[in-house]
């Protein structure tokens, strides 16, 4: 069985841990507890192939900027996450997460993930955003960011409803098993 290491990064509170817990246990966690570092594992079948998917959760908070890259060596695929209802977390994909990941692992594939899809249609959330003259991130904006950061795919999901959730991890596995033609170079991740 092939083992794949998938590291999940993104701002604090965008839903990285919920994404992983909902996927691995089919249950949505209740309260928010900031992650320092966690590991999950799932045996899955993708396209008829058994895979052991090692899922590495990371802390998005700036306090952990020096610690986080310790989880990057030998990463096969990254999920860079942002919340669809947090424009700041979307901007940080460009200014923080892509630069960090591409610095440490320049040829490792990236899946860009918009989280909290269920809240994009939530009236209360929309009102809070519009009070601050903000709007949720629309699908075309996600596609634009995918191009900018050279991500293999852009996907949206909800850990709460599980809509699009399995697809995120299936596509992460496919990015490793069937790499895009342009990424034929040997994947290596160095810690400098």
From Swiss-Prot:
UniProt entry keywords in alphabetical sequence: Cell membrane, GTP-binding, Lipoprotein, Membrane, Methylation, Nucleotide-binding, Prenylation
Residues the record lists as binding GTP: 13-18, 30-35, 116-118, 159-160
Tissue-wise expression: Highly expressed in respiratory tubes and coelomocytes. Moderate expression in intestinal tissue and body wall. Low expression in tube feet and longitudinal muscle.
Superkingdom field: Eukaryota
Lipid attachment points (S-geranylgeranyl cysteine): 189
GO process terms (BP): defense response to Gram-negative bacterium; innate immune response; small GTPase-mediated signal transduction
A molecular-function term among this protein's GO annotations: GTPase activity
Subcellular location, record wording: Cell membrane
Main localization, broad class: membrane
Name of the gene encoding the protein in the UniProt record: RAC1
Annotated membrane topology: Lipid-anchor
Family matches, as SUPFAM superfamilies: P-loop containing nucleoside triphosphate hydrolases (SSF52540)
A cellular component annotation (GO) from this entry: plasma membrane
Physiological role: Plasma membrane-associated small GTPase which cycles between active GTP-bound and inactive GDP-bound states.
Induction context: By infection with the Gram-negative bacterium V.splendidus. Following infection, expression is significantly increased at 4 hours (approximately 15-fold above control), then decreases to control levels at 8 hours. Expression increases 2-fold above control 12 hours post infection and remains constant till 48 hours post expression. By 72 hours, expression returns to control levels.
Name of the protein in question: Ras-related protein Rac1
Residues with Cysteine methyl ester modification: 189
Regions crossing the membrane: none
Family the UniProt entry places it in: Belongs to the small GTPase superfamily. Rho family.
Motif Effector region positions after renumbering to this chain: 32-40
InterPro entries, sorted: P-loop_NTPase, Small_GTP-bd, Small_GTPase, Small_GTPase_Rho
Propeptide: 190-192
């Amino acid at each position: 069985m092939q083992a794949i290491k998938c590291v999940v990064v993104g701002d604090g509170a965008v839903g990285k841990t919920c994404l992983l817990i909902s996927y691995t246990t089919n249950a949505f966690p209740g309260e928010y507890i900031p992650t320092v570092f966690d590991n999950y594992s799932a045996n899955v079948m993708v396209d008829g192939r058994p895979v052991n998917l090692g899922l590495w959760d990371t802390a998005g908070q700036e306090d952990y900027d020096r610690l986080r890259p310790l989880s990057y060596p030998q990463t096969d695929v990254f999920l860079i996450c942002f919340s669809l209802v947090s424009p700041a977390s979307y901007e940080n994909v460009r200014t923080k997460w892509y630069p960090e990941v591409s610095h440490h692992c320049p040829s490792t594939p990236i899946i860009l993930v918009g989280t909290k899809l269920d809240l994009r249609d939530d009236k209360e959330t929309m009102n809070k955003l519009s009070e601050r003259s903000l709007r949720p991130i629309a699908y075309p904006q996600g596609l634009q960011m995918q191009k900018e950061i050279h991500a293999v795919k852009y996907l949206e999901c909800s850990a709460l409803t599980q809509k699009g959730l399995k697809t995120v991890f299936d596509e992460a596995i496919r990015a490793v098993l069937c790499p895009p033609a342009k990424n034929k170079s040997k994947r290596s991740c160095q810690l400098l």
